[in-house]
Amino acid sequence: LYTYDNGDEFLTTISEDEDYYIVPSNSYHKLEWDEINDNRNFEQTTADLNFVGTLRWEQQEVVDKFFKRGRARSGVLQAPCGWGKTFTGCEIISRNKTKTLVLVHTKLLFRQWIEELERQIPGVKIGRVGDGLYDIQEITVGIYKSVYNRRDEMSEHFSMILVDEAHLCPAEMFSTALNSLNAKVKIGISA
C-alpha cells in the first residue's frame, strides 16, 4: 500500500506480512490504531565504543536531541557540507552502544566512513559489506547495492542504521534495502 498526502508532503509504504503490518517508523503518528507494539529486542554491543573526538556545541546539541529520552531516536541530521555530519555520526554510534550499520552509496564514502570511525572510535572492529567483502561486526559500513543483494541475511543484525546521503532513500533499490533491515533506530544524514 503506497500513500501520498499532498497537504503534508507525506509519502510512505505500508506492507502486510502474515499477521502484522510493516509500517515505517516515521508514519506511526499518522495511524489511528489504539496500540503499536514494537517488540523487537536488540542486544547491546559488547565492543568498547569510546568516542575520542570533541564535538562543537551545535554538534553536541544535535546528538543530545537524538538521545532526548535516554535512548537513540530515529530522525534526520541535516546540515551543510563541512559541518561534521560524519564526525557527529561517530558520536551517535558510540553513545548508542548497539550494533550499527552505516549505509553509503559509493566506495569513496565507504572508505571515508571506515577511516573516520577508526579515528574517532579507536580499537573498534569495523565490518564491511561491499567492495567484494562481507564481514559483519559491531559497527559495519555497507554499500547500498551490496546490502540490497544480501538484505535477507542481514535483516536481523542491526539495532541502528545510519544512512549517509539520506536524500537518496526514495530510490527503489535504496528504500528496499533500508526497509528490509529490521533496525529499531534509523537516522538519516543529509546536506
Predicted stretch roles:
Residues 1-41:
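Interdomain "pre-motor" coupling segment immediately N-terminal to P-loop NTPase/helicase cores
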Residues 2, 100, 107-133:
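Conserved helix-turn-beta segment of the N-terminal RecA-like "Helicase ATP-binding" lobe
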Residues 35-78:
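Conserved pre-motif I regulatory segment
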Residues 69-96:
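Walker A/P-loop
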Residues 77, 102, 140-142, 161:
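Hydrophobic positions in the central parallel beta-sheet of the AAA+
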Residues 128, 136-151:
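Conserved two-lobed SF2 helicase motor
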Residues 144-191:
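SF2 helicase catalytic motif II
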